From Swiss-Prot:
Record organism: Burkholderia pseudomallei (strain 1710b)
Organismal lineage: Bacteria, Pseudomonadati, Pseudomonadota, Betaproteobacteria, Burkholderiales
Xref: InterPro entries: AAA+_ATPase, ABC_transporter-like_ATP-bd, ABC_transporter-like_CS, ABC_transpr_MalK-like, ABC_transpr_MalK/UgpC-like, Mo/tungstate-bd_C_term_dom, NA-bd_OB-fold, OB_MalK-like
GO molecular function: ABC-type glycerol-3-phosphate transporter activity; ATP binding; ATP hydrolysis activity
Catalytic activity: sn-glycerol 3-phosphate(out) + ATP + H2O = sn-glycerol 3-phosphate(in) + ADP + phosphate + H(+)
EC number: 7.6.2.10
CDD domains referenced in this protein's UniProt entry, alphabetically: ABC_MalK_N
The protein, known as: sn-glycerol-3-phosphate import ATP-binding protein UgpC
Pfam families per UniProt: ABC_tran, OB_MalK
UniProt topology in membrane: Peripheral membrane protein
């Protein structure tokens, strides 16, 4: 195990255009960090640079205090788990898991011992004599993880390992990865576009956008205090409602651009440095919009309602803005019905319209 450090890491492909812009992060020994963002944000490129599969244009990557920029992947003491399992079809599970050690010249007895230990951790013991075609998708991914475990690396790198699995298997594998990290406590960097994976697996999340680390923090902090409108719209399902408009002079109402005046339950700017009487992007999460007894509320004409099982999502519009409200299971408004909706000051987020950055 080892700490991982990235200092001013940048990447370009021979021109002035950078695809990664000065990434700085220190990952502690044993920490599980998730790189999350949409396609093209640079998360997989950054992971490949850590692995040594891409060169570093500028900056420094260090593993265990040793700068690895010039080292080949095999010399970095890392193990990688890919989206595609990359198993040899003619080999058994045991042979697949131990093959990396075999080509490194590790003694057969040690290979067998490590394979057996990894198989016990991943519950692969009964499958060791099978070939990949005889395995389910989840079992194949466990074999790929086992192949990484037997190397006993300083750092695990996961490149969207669950993308090929169905929804039920993804949930199961998330739990298995959590248990694996709790048991091994190996420094891990995990790439995904799925914010549910990011929120459930990470000790810290790095939200990537257009080659920048938009926000770095614990999942709960990123969710509760998004640093930018991008993070607010990307983290959370459904996304945070973002409304362009103006906060009234007394902070008691918000005038939505080309939309209604919405009463605010409490003083919106109190103690937060939110200037009244100016333009803001106001954010509020769908689960925070159900009015409490005695709170001021607005109304929303329901366009549609999604029945999700444990809860429901009502959708409508204020001006040009789509609005989603999370409701209890028993509330199922129909199209055209008017829904009371609150904007509680304690749950409001304000962003600068010019920069998209959080205020207060």
């Amino acid at each position: 195990m080892a700490a991982l450090s990235l200092k001013g890491v940048r990447k370009s492909y021979g021109g002035a255009q950078y695809v990664l812009h000065g990434i700085d992060v220190d990952i502690a020994d044993g920490e599980f960090v998730v790189l999350v963002g949409p396609s093209g944000c640079g998360k997989s490129t950054l992971l490949r640079m850590i692995a040594g599969l891409e060169t570093v244009t500028e900056g420094e990557i260090a593993i265990g205090g040793r700068v690895v920029n010039a080292l080949e992947p095999k010399d970095r003491d890392i193990a990688m788990v890919f989206q595609n399992y990359a198993l040899y079809p003619h080999m058994t599970v045991a042979q697949n898991m131990g093959y990396g050690l075999k080509i490194r010249g590790v003694e057969r007895a040690l290979i067998d011992a490590r394979v057996q230990a990894a198989a016990q951790i991943l519950e692969l013991g009964p499958l060791l004599a099978r070939r990949p075609r005889e395995l389910s998708g989840g079992q194949r991914q466990r074999v790929a993880m086992g192949r990484a475990i037997v190397r006993e690396p300083s750092v695990f790198l996961f490149d969207e390992p669950l993308s090929n699995l169905d929804a039920k298997l993804r949930v199961q594998m998330r739990l298995e990865i959590q248990r694996l990290h709790a048991r091994l406590a190996t420094t891990s960097v995990y790439v995904t576009h799925d914010q549910i994976e990011a929120m459930t697996l990470a000790q810290r999340v790095i939200v990537m956008n257009r080659g920048y680390a938009e926000q770095i923090g614990a999942p709960v902090d990123v969710y509760e205090k998004p640093a930018t409108t991008f993070v607010a719209s990307f983290i959370g399902s459904p996304a945070m409602n973002l409304l362009h408009g103006r906060l009234s002079e007394d902070g008691a109402a918000f005038d939505v651009a080309d939309g209604p005046r919405l009463p605010v339950a409490g003083s919106a700017g109190a103690g937060r440095g939110i200037a009244p009487g100016r333009e803001w992007i106001l954010g509020v999460r769908p689960e925070h919009m159900t009015p409490q007894p005695g709170e001021a509320f607005a109304t929303l004409a329901v366009d549609s309602c999604e029945l999700l099982g444990a809860d429901n999502l009502a959708h409508g519009r204020w001006g040009a803005h789509d609005v989603a409200v999370r409701l209890p299971h028993a509330m199922r408004p129909t199209r055209g019905e008017t829904l009371p909706v609150a904007l509680p000051a304690r749950h409001l987020h304000f962003f600068d319209p010019a920069t998209g950055k959080r205020a207060g």
